């Protein structure tokens, strides 16, 4: 960890602007109201659950949100970072007992995991939100929360209208729509964005611009050209004739780091267990196969994954149901006079990512009422779909993808098993609109060493998905 990490090239002028913002709190009216609203939302998220033990705040500024976090969670270890040394100094004075670093929030060099990462009015300064969200997901504990606000499409509408009316360009950044913000979440973050308009009584154009300078928010859109003094005067006069208020469109993002992944397949016997071992190794995860059949013929998938991924017993959760016959869970249970009750099953507690392996394909019946896919949908885990690489795989894989999407299940990607087939891979990626995470070739011998090598390859693809 570097407590004073070098900022990116675009961050340098941003930090300089905020360092000069001596009267920030007086002018940051909307920022203060938004920090209060975000704190209220965070309090509601934790009203019926355990409070976060470790919190990371991005872009803490002078400590408006930091103060509220400290009051909400007095026993938490709070780390707050900001690009501006001046802002950090003021926050440290206002809210003692917090760990402060001068650091680029888009590239935090910190050791996780954190239970809560939050930020108010920081991520609009990021160069690459999607990449930043992936990095933040890596810092969250499984089940941890991301709670942020940012400016969204529709902000400063009155100023933009005045510029357009005068036929002049607006130098303000183009803020994203809620749909774009949602698309920026990696698969490992599942959540929503909600919008709210806050109207600020700025009075006049001059006061509005002065307040922006006061809070240091003067970095223009990249590539924009500054207005001449005459042009700026025209826009200000038009604004004053039109209104004395300014709209801030606020986006509230709330997401949870998924607790793991669900590994399933287009059929039985296609390599789900092999892929589960590889994924478990790649993510340093805990493994669980809730429904195990066929124990009359073999030791079972739990034993195989334990050996191949070299797992200690603490990272292996025994099956909830284990049956002798190599049949569907419904039929295997019936032969033993039993019945599977999936409603009684919830995800086991684990401080690691969980890899949950299914039984057979998606449409395997668990009992007379429930298919495997319907139970899996209740877990809120993104899916890794294992398919064959050869003839027939396009149809089977696309049908499985369609079944997952009908149930609003997130798909982390597809892993193909067998002799690599570039045409089939391209068709599945194109028509399925999913990433192909890896192609696992046929292995004459499967050993822990083979699993380790394949895990190193798959780890990069999973990392790009936020795991």
Regions found by a protein language model. Give the residues of each.
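A short acidic, Gly/Pro-enriched loop at the edge of an enzyme's catalytic core
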Residues: 106-117
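Conserved alpha-helix/loop element of class I SAM-dependent methyltransferases that forms part
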Residues: 29-51
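C-terminal lobe/tail of nucleotide-utilizing enzymes
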Residues: 401-467
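A short glycine-rich, Lys/Arg-flanked "PGG" loop and its adjoining helix->strand segment in the class I
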Residues: 130-142
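Class I SAM-dependent methyltransferase SAM/SAH-binding core
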Residues: 54-108
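N-terminal phosphate/diphosphate-binding loop that engages ATP/GTP or pyrophosphate donors
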Residues: 274-337
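Conserved catalytic/acceptor-binding region of the Class I
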Residues: 145-205, 218-226
